[in-house]
Curated annotation (Swiss-Prot):
Motif (Internalization motif): 836-839
Gene it is expressed from: gB
Function: Envelope glycoprotein that forms spikes at the surface of virion envelope. Essential for the initial attachment to heparan sulfate moieties of the host cell surface proteoglycans. Involved in fusion of viral and cellular membranes leading to virus entry into the host cell. Following initial binding to its host receptors, membrane fusion is mediated by the fusion machinery composed at least of gB and the heterodimer gH/gL. May be involved in the fusion between the virion envelope and the outer nuclear membrane during virion egress.
Protein's recorded name: Envelope glycoprotein B
Provenance organism: Equine herpesvirus 2 (strain 86/87) (EHV-2)
Glycosylated position list: N171, N247, N281, N302, N323, N348, N356, N376, N409, N412, N444, N558, N610, N624
């Protein structure tokens, strides 16, 4: 409150100042002959603008006309009590972002058709294509029960029924065996791991081979709410719900209907290597699609999937109620959860899948605090601003229960006190349309919400609690201190009201106690440059009388008359010189004037000191406050990395790893359509094909005939080879080889015998005949003549036979002979005949025809005896 005097107060002060200072000025003028000069103090208010007592001023209180005040002696301190806190168990449930994961079995038959070219040194695959076909139910049962299948597949393609046999053989039972894999979530069983790519043995021919492989894939599938489709681990998307319709035989939703779908009850799927008797019977869906079949366990949505999942549970949580919200905190996490005051209606009906789990978790948490706390009412459910659900079970301390029971003489120590609020089993019904994140809304928009708001809320709650605690203590201490200060000022005002009121107002004022109130008026500032202090403190004309404070001279602002007074405390000028005392010996005095301190010894000025050279006595009491404790924020994972990885129905990592591993480990030859062109393996066939194409229809006929012949011989050779591959044919081949070896050995032995003794081999009994009596062998000359005669006889018979055959063939000349004779005649005519003419045969023997050419020595002219030809010069 500002204090200001009226015009009358100012006028009175001026009059009083003029009357008092007029006589003093005359005395000051009379003292100008004193040997001690005066000292003019320095007043620089700008050096310390925070100190309002530096300027020289004149203060005087008027008994009337000033402002009057009184001190308040009755004060009430404000109430700083905090909000109500309730202990309890808190279970926090979050939205389940992990899709529904279940096991499926995929069945298919893979037909691979491979065309191989048989080259001279290398073989080449010129074409290869693979098709996948669905497996019917009767064969799927063989796969699920016994891990067997048929090695053939019969399909209807373009209106034609085609049958493919594995290894181009016949239909037989094949056994499934585990295949190599990379990921543990996918297991394959197959019947034929190798591609049939063996060419025929006929060179420069093409062969088509067929491979049929039965494959069963055990893997997982995923479906996300609203469960309109699901995706397998290998990337197949099935546009239907995986769940069974309530009281139905089909899935809940079917966006694209398969070729057929059946519900199989009490269907057993055995494990590999385990008998059918140990399989568990279950209800399964079986669907046939375009190129594969699929089966999975049929369950309802309510029994298999839940929209909420437990995140964290706390047995020592605190609930704080504010004006429009509830705050839940726990020491285990640095987060505070804010919820409306209203409870969630029909939570146990909306989320039946977790309600039983909620009761079990509450019982587990109760066991942790059963020695100190008891339940206080039933569980309540609240929904946070981050789409989390808090199941709250209030607790009460056992000591409070016992005290309350003794107070009201209750026999049951576990009864809840009537003053403690309990929860009624009946909850207020709310509009279910306002409840977001329900289990049957069909929307999957309730996903992960950032928990940063919860952490900020926790930090704010901790800061608010700490600050409110400090402010509460300060408020109470401040209130008590102010009350005590009022009492102290009231008592001090009776002694020196001016000092008390100046301290209270924070600026120089003049005060006077008039009864039970204090009259306050302002001070008047003087001309600061006109103020000077006397160095002599003795009263003139009186040797034993001295001033208690130095005498000063000053002028009022805009005034020319000089006034005298005494230097008061804190630069105040007293408008009188009546403050005197009996002079004392060996005394010192220090007085502050302006910004300096004057030292007087024996009432005479000695020196000037700076205010900073004199130490100060601190009477301030330091307020010791406990600062707000540090809070280290920790990242709270609402959803773990595993949950985030599983939140997508497409497991891209597993799909690509499995696909790459499966394609890179196929046992067989790779597809290579341009192999023959790039490497020149069948250039001859290509050239021959171009020639036949140029021939047109004739070329096609030749190619067809040649292809038929080659195919016939190829089939014969392949049949022979296939026969030898058969066990019976192989045994027969081994027997024939052994028989041939024996025959060759016998023939070689007989040949050596004939070479060593030909007569004995021809006539085995010749040796016995030579031993008979009367047998005499002929001479060697006779034997030689006989052999020569036999040789000539044999040669003559052979010559006669050849002559007879020539006579028979003479009139039957072939086309080749006619062409040869014609060509020979043309050549002879072009060369002029060479002077030769054909010899005529007159029926004589061969020797007679050439008799004129015989020489005297028995030879023939121009005849090469060894070669048997004549040099005719042609």
């Amino acid at each position: 409150m500002g204090v200001g005097g009226g015009p009358r107060v100012v006028l009175c002060l001026w009059c009083v100042a003029a009357l008092l200072c007029q006589g003093v000025a005359q005395e000051v003028v009379a003292e100008t002959t004193t040997p001690f000069a005066t000292h003019r103090p320095e007043v620089v208010a700008e050096e310390n603008p925070a100190n309002p007592f530096l300027p020289f001023r004149v203060c005087g209180a008027s008994p009337t006309g000033g402002e009057i005040f009184r001190f308040p002696l009755e004060e009430s301190c404000p109430n700083t009590e905090d909000k109500d806190h309730i202990e309890g168990i808190a279970l926090i449930y979050k939205t389940n972002i992990v899709p529904y994961v279940f096991n499926v079995r995929k069945y298919r038959k893979i037909m691979t058709s491979t065309t191989i070219y048989k080259g001279w040194s290398e073989d080449a695959i010129t074409n290869q294509h693979t098709r996948s076909y669905a497996v019917p139910l009767y064969e799927v049962q063989m796969m699920d029960h016994y891990y067997q299948c048929f090695s053939a597949v019969q399909v209807n393609e373009g209106g034609h029924v085609n049958t493919y046999y594995d290894r181009d053989g016949w239909n037989e039972t094949a056994f499934l065996k585990p295949a190599d894999g990379l990921t543990s979530s996918i297991t394959r069983y197959q019947s034929q791991p190798e591609v049939y790519a063996t060419p025929r043995n006929l060179l420069w021919s093409y062969t088509t081979r067929t491979t049929v492989n039965c494959e069963v894939t055990e893997m997982s599938a995923r479906s996300m709410k609203p469960f309109e489709f699901f995706v397998t681990s290998v990337g197949d998307t099935i546009e239907m719900s995986p769940f069974l319709k309530e009281n139905g035989t089909e899935p809940e939703k079917i966006l694209k209907r398969p070729h057929s779908i059946q519900l199989l009850k009490n269907y057993a799927v055995t494990k590999y290597g385990v008998g059918l008797g140990q399989a568990d019977n279950a209800t399964r869906f079986f669907a046939i699609f375009g190129d594969y079949s699929l089966s999975w366990k049929a369950t309802t949505e309510n029994s298999s999937y839940c929209d909420l999942i437990l995140w964290k549970g706390f047995s020592n949580a605190i609930q704080t109620q504010h004006n429009s919200s509830l705050h839940f905190i726990a020491n285990d996490i640095t987060a505070s959860f804010s919820t409306p005051l209203e409870e969630e209606a029909n939570f146990n009906e909306t989320f039946k899948c977790i309600w039983n789990n909620t009761q079990e978790e509450i019982q587990k948490k109760l066991k942790e605090v059963e020695k100190t706390h008891r339940p206080n009412g039933t569980a309540k459910v609240y929904k946070t601003t981050g789409n989390l659900y808090i199941v709250w079970q209030p607790l009460i301390q056992i000591d409070l229960l016992d005290t309350h029971a003794k107070l009201y003489n209750l026999t049951n120590a576990t009864a809840s006190p009537t003053s403690t609020p309990t929860t009624s089993p009946r909850r207020r019904r709310r509009d279910t349309s306002s409840v977001s994140g329900g289990g049957n809304n069909g929307d999957n928009s309730t996903k992960e919400e950032s928990v940063a708001a919860s952490q900020v809320q926790f930090a704010y709650d901790n800061l608010r609690k700490s600050i409110n605690r400090v402010l509460g203590e300060l408020s109470r201490a401040w209130c008590r201190e102010q009350y005590r200060a009022s009492l102290m000022w009231y008592e001090l005002s009776k002694i020196n009201p001016t000092s008390v009121m100046s301290a209270i107002y924070g600026r120089p004022v003049s005060a006077k106690l008039i009864g039970d109130v204090v009259s306050v008026s302002d001070c008047i500032s003087v001309d600061q440059k006109s103020v000077f202090v006397h160095k002599n403190m003795k009263v003139p004309g009186k040797e034993d009388l001295c001033y208690t404070r130095p005498v000063v001279g000053f002028k009022f602002i805009n005034g020319s008359e000089l006034f005298a007074g005494q230097l008061g405390p804190r630069n105040e000028i007293v408008l009188s010189t009546s403050q005197v005392e009996v002079c004392q010996h060996s005394c010192e005095h220090y007085f502050q004037a302006g910004n300096q301190m004057y030292k007087y010894k024996d009432y005479y000025y000695v020196s000037t000191l700076n205010l900073t050279d004199i130490p100060t006595l601190h009477t301030m009491i330091t307020l010791n406050l406990s600062l707000v404790e540090n809070i280290d924020f920790k990242v709270i994972e609402l959803y773990s990395k595993t949950e985030k990885r599983l939140s997508n129905v497409f497991d891209i990592e597993t799909m690509f790893r499995e696909y790459n591993y499966y394609t890179q480990n196929l046992n067989g030859l790779r597809k290579d359509l341009d192999d023959s062109i790039d490497h020149g393996r069948d250039s001859f066939i290509q050239t021959l094909g171009d020639i036949m194409q140029d021939l047109g229809t004739i070329g096609k006929v030749v190619v067809n005939v040649a292809s038929g012949v080659f195919s016939l011989f190829g089939s014969i050779v392949s049949g022979v080879i296939s026969f030898f591959k058969n066990p019976f044919g192989g045994m027969l081949l081994i027997v024939l080889i052994i028989a041939g070896v024996v025959v060759v050995y016998l023939f070689m032995t007989r040949s050596r015998s004939i070479y060593s003794a030909p007569i004995r081999m021809l006539y085995p009994g010749v040796e016995r005949a030579a031993q008979e009596p009367g047998a005499h062998p002929v001479s060697e000359d006779q034997i030689r003549n006989i052999l020569m005669g036999m040789h000539q006889f044999q040669q003559r018979q052979r010559a006669e036979e050849e002559a007879r055959r020539e006579e028979e063939v003479k009139g039957k000349r072939t086309l080749f002979e006619v062409i040869r004779d014609s060509a020979t005649s043309v050549l002879r005519r072009r060369r002029g005949g060479g002077g030769y003419q054909r010899l005529q045969r007159d029926g004589s023997d061969d020797e007679g025809d050439y008799e004129p050419l015989r020489r005297q020595d028995g030879g023939y002219d121009d005849v090469d005896v060894e070669a048997g030809t004549a040099d005719t010069g042609v």
